[in-house]
From Swiss-Prot:
It comes from Neisseria meningitidis serogroup C (strain 053442). Could be a nuclease involved in processing of the 5'-end of pre-16S rRNA. Belongs to the YqgF nuclease family. SUPFAM superfamilies: Ribonuclease H-like (SSF53098). It is found in: Cytoplasm. This is Putative pre-16S rRNA nuclease. GO terms for biological process: rRNA 5'-end processing. The keyword Ribosomal protein does not apply. Pfam families: RuvX (PF03652).
């Protein structure tokens, strides 16, 4: 258990094709879907993220860490960690990794309840998953912090 830091956060549901982004504030306990970063090179993706960082001025990042249902590493675990380290390196902000095991299931459930289907669903699914990741972080779920130093 942890207490989420004060201030604005940007959360990411990292994928090689799409990166869902959510924004929130721990003090208010609120988070909302923000954007989906798609396609292009890593430089193009980070340019899009830089615009969001400039607009929202976060104090830290939260990145979903994919693991299997039994808690073992997933093939995307390493890539998500690498993405988080790159965020830290480019923006010099702490990164919190959180277990994202059920974020997509939660996002699918929310979108079904809201009757969001088809192309609209695909366009917001990763954002809503990022929102679920951030919500779990705000609720005090387990998290691991990276602030530019290994160990």
């Amino acid at each position: 258990m942890h207490k989420a830091p004060k201030g604005t956060a940007l959360a990411f549901d990292f994928g090689e094709t799409r990166i869902g982004v959510a924004q929130g504030d721990a003090e208010l306990g609120l988070s909302h879907p923000l954007s989906t970063v798609t396609g292009g090179s890593n430089d193009e993706k980070f340019a899009a993220i830089a615009k969001l960082v400039q607009e929202w001025q976060p104090r830290y990042f939260v990145v979903g860490l994919p693991v299997h249902t039994d808690g073992t590493k997933h093939e995307m675990t390493h890539l998500s960690r690498k993405f988080g380290r790159r965020l830290n390196g480019r923006f010099n902000l702490p990164v919190y990794w959180v277990d994202e095991r059920l974020s997509s299931v939660y996002a699918e459930s929310l979108l079904s309840e809201a009757q969001v289907f088809g192309k609209k669903r695909k366009s917001v699914l990763d954002q809503v998953a990022a929102q679920a990741i951030l919500h779990g972080f705000f609720e005090g779920g387990p998290a691991e912090c990276f602030n530019g130093r290994e160990g």
